[in-house]
Amino acid sequence: MHKNTNKSVLVEDLGLIDYQQAWDYQTQLFNSTIEKKLALRDLPEDEQVAPGNFLIFCEHPHVYTLGKSGKREHLLISEAQLQHAQAAYYEINRGGDITYHGPGQLVGYPIFDLDNFFTDIHKYLRYIEEAIILTLADFNIVAGRIDGLTGVWIESDNPLKARKICAMGVKASRWVTMHGFALNVQPDLTYFKNIVPCGIDDKAVTSIEQELNTTVSMQAVKDYLLKHLTALFELHIENTTHTT
């Protein structure tokens, strides 16, 4: 842990952005944060100022991403079918299996230096899940966890009806995180039929829109989620920038 912790966070809303472009950007922030941490070691302890943190909100055009522990066969369509669906495909460096991102899904990439908070990846994941659960409660949706599975679920205590509403997958090095979560607000859920989501073949997926049978404001979801992340991690929000 840093002696002088820094819980400031710069929030950036990138809007709809190409997956590769967002991946490159968060990688840049991730690497820069690690470099700043390493540079601190050469300074006297009382002069060390911990690097700040970043939180990216965005949506992506249709894309499937496969994590390091995933299986290529969990993508159930061919290259030609991918092109017909106007969807991209990437094999990436986060944990987890395959998932889908698309318009109407809120993607969050926290680039947090956990030395500013707590050095426990499992606790970090549970905090992210809790922020999602509290956000869904703001829309009168009851959500929870399933033991042994990362993410957030509706009717999590009913194996026959449990359905996933938020997927998660992260990478961490020197306690700096990247990648994050994908909350289904109102995406086209038919795209999930082309994969075995997160490598789990016996659970359905859902969205806020499907659960409520009505559309909701993406901005409202972001606002609630930021409120809960701020409270859980005791963040100090520097400012929020929007890219259109």
UniProtKB/Swiss-Prot annotation:
Identify the species of origin.
Cytophaga hutchinsonii (strain ATCC 33406 / DSM 1761 / CIP 103989 / NBRC 15051 / NCIMB 9469 / D465)
Q: What is this protein called?
A: Octanoyltransferase
**Localization (cell):** Cytoplasm
The enzyme's E.C. designation: 2.3.1.181
Entries under HAMAP family matching the protein: LipB
Instruction: Please share what else the UniProt entry notes about this protein.
Output: In the reaction, the free carboxyl group of octanoic acid is attached via an amide linkage to the epsilon-amino group of a specific lysine residue of lipoyl domains of lipoate-dependent enzymes.
List the catalytic activities from the record: octanoyl-[ACP] + L-lysyl-[protein] = N(6)-octanoyl-L-lysyl-[protein] + holo-[ACP] + H(+)
Q: What is its main location?
A: cytoplasm
Point out the coiled-coil segments of this chain.
Answer: none
- Enzyme class, top EC level, equals transferase
- Which Gene Ontology cellular-component terms appear in the entry? cytoplasm
Q: Source organism's superkingdom?
A: Bacteria
Q: Sum up the protein's function in the record's words.
A: Catalyzes the transfer of endogenously produced octanoic acid from octanoyl-acyl-carrier-protein onto the lipoyl domains of lipoate-dependent enzymes. Lipoyl-ACP can also act as a substrate although octanoyl-ACP is likely to be the physiological substrate.
- What pathway is this protein a component of? Protein modification; protein lipoylation via endogenous pathway; protein N(6)-(lipoyl)lysine from octanoyl-[acyl-carrier-protein]: step 1/2
A GO molecular function for this record?
lipoyl(octanoyl) transferase activity
InterPro entries the UniProt entry points to = aa-tRNA-synth_II/BPL/LPL, BPL_LPL_catalytic, Octanoyltransferase, Octanoyltransferase_CS
